[in-house]
Amino acid sequence: MTIKLAITPGEPAGVGPDLIITLAQQQWQAMLVVFANAELMRTRANELNIPLTLLPYDASRTDIQPAGSLYIVDIPLQDEVIAGKLNPTNSQYVLDTLHQACQMNLNGEFQALVTGPVHKGVINEAGIPFSGHTEFFAQQSNTPEVVMMLATEGLRVTLATTHIPVTAVSAAITQPKLDNVIRIIDHDLRTKFGIAKPHIFVCGLNPHAGEDGHIGREEIDTIIPALNALRQEGITLTGPLPADTIFNPKYLQQADTVLAMYHDQGLPVLKYKGFSQAVNITLGLPFIRTSVDHGTALDLAATGQADVGSFSIAIKEAISLAKSTQ
């Protein structure tokens, strides 16, 4: 069966369209279907001086596009797009691309969804509450809990909490929360990654993982009891370990993922190890979703200088995961 990937460029004034146009010059082993405004894509291709053929998407087609072309689901813009210049009026367009791509994954027409970078600030400036792709797709699919994973060669990092203030992290780390998060990670490592018995390494929340309660009690009161209960069910867990020692080869060679308690505990290490070579994967959704690990890079839009590395890896990972679930 031909793998069909739904691809959203994200912020139209950013580098998302550029990256997709550039990557379309390659031959891929999947149908790449971009959910975007056709005129925007043509204009950006002309600005980049890259030839691009847009093929109207038809659900009955299964032939992979030739290099230099993309299938497209044409979605209307609200206003003109100027590369590098944010326009809140087009925020609804961004959400329309995400909504349509999500719905067509939910109905089984596509095998995976790959997303380009959005600008959360301009969407909120338009009066639309938006905290990120991950939360948006969870709401769209009626999924009560999802988990953010970022992966690069030799390292996968998952997050117990995502886009919340550091001051709110401790209260968000509860036994039910950890129970849900770890079950999702274990399930998706088995079903989407094909890992028969995943081994999850878990960070503590506090420095030195709490130092036996002397530097915070979250480990003793919450994290350790949650891990022990899950171990009784056969889930393989190591931790909680101090975050400043868990990311070393002794542990990483055994770990299928490292679970960090909050965003900036785990992701700086991941991005240092795999800058421009990492992929964002949402666990817990009823479909495969991968994304770039970078922002909109407005200053690089239409310059031809944007690095395609992360977007390329996001597409390759989506194809790999789709094949493993066929």
Swiss-Prot record:
Q: Name one GO cellular component term.
A: cytoplasm
| Residues involved in a divalent metal cation binding | H163, H208, H263
Which pathway does this chain act in?
Cofactor biosynthesis; pyridoxine 5'-phosphate biosynthesis; pyridoxine 5'-phosphate from D-erythrose 4-phosphate: step 4/5
Q: Which reaction does it catalyse?
A: 4-(phosphooxy)-L-threonine + NAD(+) = 3-amino-2-oxopropyl phosphate + CO2 + NADH
Q: Which cofactor does it need?
A: Zn(2+); Mg(2+); Co(2+)
Instruction: Tell me where on the tree of life, at the top rank, the source sits.
Output: Bacteria
Known EC number: 1.1.1.262
One molecular function GO term is: NAD binding
For whether the record's keyword set contains Zinc, the answer is yes
Q: Where in the cell is it found?
A: Cytoplasm
GO annotation (BP), single: pyridoxine biosynthetic process
The note describing how and how many cofactors are bound reads: Binds 1 divalent metal cation per subunit. Can use ions such as Zn(2+), Mg(2+) or Co(2+).
Q: Which Gene3D superfamilies does the record cross-reference, listed alphabetically?
A: Isopropylmalate Dehydrogenase
Instruction: Give the UniProt keywords, A-Z.
Output: Cobalt, Cytoplasm, Magnesium, Metal-binding, NAD, NADP, Oxidoreductase, Pyridoxine biosynthesis, Zinc
User: What SUPFAM superfamilies does the entry give?
Assistant: Isocitrate/Isopropylmalate dehydrogenase-like (SSF53659)
Binding-site residues, substrate: H133, T134, K271, N280, R289
UniProt key word Cell wall biogenesis/degradation: no
Subunit description:
Homodimer.
Could you tell me which HAMAP family the record lists for this protein? PdxA
Family under the similarity heading: Belongs to the PdxA family.
Q: Name the job this protein performs.
A: Catalyzes the NAD(P)-dependent oxidation of 4-(phosphooxy)-L-threonine (HTP) into 2-amino-3-oxo-4-(phosphooxy)butyric acid which spontaneously decarboxylates to form 3-amino-2-oxopropyl phosphate (AHAP).
Q: What else is known?
A: The active site is located at the dimer interface.
What protein is this chain from?
4-hydroxythreonine-4-phosphate dehydrogenase
The organism named in the record is Pseudoalteromonas atlantica (strain T6c / ATCC BAA-1087)
